[in-house]
Each structure stands twice: as structure tokens, then as C-alpha cells.
């Protein structure tokens, strides 16, 4: 390993701590969509061992935060033998893993629950800051309930790994509500959500959100999903993969939702106004 790595990391973390203090959690994502120089388990173990040790030179209480996208995107290369060697070279409970894309693939299931290291079940839900209405709500709920039951003692909570903020807030509110009450039926949660967003009990609002839940939020977000209004101009088609304008629902159904929201009445609750504008623009 390059001896400068530990030196540079030490100086960086020291300066960062001077500026911001520390919560003793440090993010490092080696080999993210990059192949290591060697795939030998011993080499991979040596890498992770030295990454963590260089953190402890600055903070003896350091915990390493690592996303596990690499185990998903290069799964054919990251065999369980290699994953185990990489993870177990760090002291137990000093590595916190983000299972990055669980609405699509739950890596914890493929890696014997990360061989005992703590991990968070994470909902990605957003590539590149797109603002489409998308999310496989019911499947996400089932997967969260399952990880609570079968995720092992090292399952440490829920997280989110979205690639853009202020987008599609419904799915993230849904996911994080499960951290507080995983057993609350979705039918009850949807009604409570509708009431909160308008500031009172309103049947039109409840029906609108029930229809969104049943008919709109049914499939996960796609890579490059976005409207043609946001696409680069072209004479034919949609240009390239970065803008995929297809949607998995009927716009007539979405228009019906919008009508219900508008019929809910004159309310100045900011969340309700957001919903009216958000559904309308879509």
C-alpha cells in the first residue's frame, strides 16, 4: 500500500476535526466502481485494515462508515470470500455499512448479513436528483418488515442514499416512519399522512393519497428518469439515457388525484400547497 495514504488521511482528518469537531464517524468508500489492484482476499483485508488503522491514529474512537454499492455493482467480482476478508479485517462494530440500494437488491441477504458487521437498510430511490413520482412502496414496506425480523442482531437501522435532496418526499417519509413504528398498517399511515399535510381530517385528501399509494407509487425510480421538459433538445426521441420520460402509471389517474386535491378546499397549509403544485406539474 502507498505509505502516503495514511499520512494524507491523518492530516486531512486532523484539519477536518479542527474545523468541524467530530462525531467519531468517518466515511471512506474504497473501490467504488473501481477495481482494486489485486482481488486476493489477503490484499483486500490488508487494505481495509490499514484504512481503519489510519483513522484511529487521529481518533481512537473512530467508526468507519462504508457504503456497499461496490458489492452490488460488481457482485460478480466481489465474491463472499472477498467480501468477508475485506469486512472482517476491521474490528467488530467499528465498521458501519450502508446497504445502498435495498429497494432493488438487498446485499445483506447475499453476504450472510455482512458477516456480523453492523449495517443500515437503505432506500436509494433517486438517481441524479430526478423529481419523478416513483417508488415501490408496498415492496419496500415488506422488505423493511423482513429485515427487522430476519436481519440479524447487527442490523442497526434504516437509512437513505438518495442522489438529490428535495425530491419525492413521500417515499422518504414512508421509509423513515418505519424506524419509529414498523407495525403501523399502511392504510392507517396513509390517512395520518394526508391529515398532517392538510392540517385536518379531510376525506378528499385521504382519497387522493390512497390513490397515489395504490396506483402511482408502485414501481421504483429508474436510472435517468425525468420529463422531456428537462431534456436536452433533439430532433428525434429523447436524446440519450439521461432522460427517460416513460412513467409506470396512467396520467388520467394522476389527473384524478389532482382533482381530489383541488376539491379538498381552500387551505393554506404549506404541505398541502406543495402537493397541489407537485402533482399538477407532473
What are these regions (language model features)?
Residues 229, 234-282:
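Histidine-centered catalytic/metal-binding microenvironments
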Residues 224-228:
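Ligand-binding clefts/hinges and TM-proximal coupling segments of bilobed small-molecule sensing domains
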Residues 1-213, 218-222, 238-243, 247-251:
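Catalytic-core regions of glycoside hydrolase
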Amino acid at each position: 500500500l502507498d505509505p502516503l495514504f495514511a499520512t494524507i488521511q491523518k492530516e486531512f482528518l486532523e484539519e477536518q476535526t479542527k474545523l468541524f469537531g467530530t462525531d467519531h464517524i468517518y466515511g471512506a468508500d474504497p473501490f467504488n466502481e473501481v477495481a482494486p489492484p489485486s482481488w486476493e482476499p489477503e490484499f483486500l483485508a490488508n487494505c481495509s485494515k490499514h484504512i481503519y488503522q489510519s483513522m484511529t491514529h487521529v481518533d481512537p474512537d473512530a467508526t468507519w462508515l462504508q457504503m456497499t454499492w461496490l458489492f452490488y455493482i460488481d457482485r460478480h467480482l466481489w465474491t463472499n470470500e472477498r467480501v468477508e476478508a475485506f469486512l472482517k479485517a476491521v474490528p467488530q462494530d467499528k465498521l458501519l455499512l450502508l446497504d445502498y440500494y435495498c429497494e432493488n437488491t438487498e446485499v445483506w441477504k447475499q453476504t450472510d448479513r455482512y458477516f456480523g458487521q453492523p449495517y443500515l437498510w437503505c432506500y436509494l430511490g433517486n438517481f441524479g436528483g430526478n423529481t419523478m413520482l416513483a417508488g415501490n412502496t408496498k415492496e419496500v414496506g415488506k422488505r423493511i418488515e423482513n429485515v427487522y425480523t430476519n436481519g440479524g442482531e447487527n442490523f442497526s437501522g434504516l437509512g437513505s442514499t438518495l442522489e438529490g435532496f428535495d425530491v419525492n418526499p413521500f417515499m422518504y417519509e414512508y421509509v423513515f416512519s418505519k424506524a419509529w413504528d414498523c407495525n403501523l398498517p399502511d392504510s392507517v399511515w396513509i390517512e395520518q399522512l394526508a391529515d398532517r399535510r392538510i392540517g385536518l381530517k379531510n376525506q378528499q385528501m385521504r382519497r387522493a393519497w390512497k390513490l397515489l399509494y395504490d396506483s402511482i407509487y408502485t414501481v421504483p425510480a429508474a436510472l435517468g428518469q425525468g420529463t422531456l421538459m428537462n431534456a436536452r433538445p433533439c430532433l428525434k426521441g429523447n436524446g440519450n439515457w439521461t432522460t427517460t420520460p416513460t412513467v409506470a402509471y396512467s396520467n388520467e389517474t394522476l389527473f384524478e388525484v389532482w382533482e381530489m386535491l383541488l376539491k379538498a378546499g381552500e387551505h393554506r397549509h404549506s404541505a398541502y400547497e406543495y402537493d397541489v403544485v407537485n402533482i399538477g406539474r407532473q
